């Protein structure tokens, strides 16, 4: 399950243009997944979207992308069923459900589960996690414990 989760004010979610650029210039997965650039909302669109929300949930799981996206989708649905009809989730990293993405929403095998990655939309995961009180740092060794973050805009 979830290692830790926190409710935060949506103003604590940091969106910056450079984040999306790190996807474009430096990520070998760029353009290969529907939940990554160039198929995802721009930082400007994300900033506009965040103005429509006041509360969000940020959570982390130990390094398991499938678990992250499964929890993300389950929580988003649960918030929706509880009356939070604007609930909208963001994952971390590319979609884990297919070995290779078709990169076509009409042909997607998991269209109900695809959610944009925070990074692809310009969300600075490091600063947002720090704002929520999570300890987060750059990992310098592959043996260090990895946490993946998910975010749900609630209302």
Each PLM stretch: what is its role?
Residues 3-33, 37-155:
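Catalytic cores of enzyme domains
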């Amino acid at each position: 399950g979830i290692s830790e989760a926190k409710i935060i004010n949506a103003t604590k979610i940091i969106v910056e243009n450079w984040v999306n650029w790190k996807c474009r210039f430096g990520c070998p997965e760029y353009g290969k997944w529907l939940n990554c650039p160039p198929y995802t909302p721009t930082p400007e669109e994300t900033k506009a979207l965040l103005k429509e929300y006041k509360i969000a949930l940020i959570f982390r799981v130990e390094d398991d992308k499938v678990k992250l996206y499964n929890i993300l989708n389950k929580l988003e649905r649960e918030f929706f069923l509880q009356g939070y009809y604007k609930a909208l989730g963001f994952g971390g990293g590319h979609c884990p459900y297919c070995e290779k993405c078709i990169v076509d929403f009409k042909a997607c095998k998991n269209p109900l589960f695809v959610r944009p990655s925070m990074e692809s939309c310009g969300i600075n995961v490091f600063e947002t996690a720090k704002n929520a009180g999570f300890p987060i740092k750059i990992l310098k060794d592959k043996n260090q414990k990895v946490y993946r973050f998910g975010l749900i805009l609630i209302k």
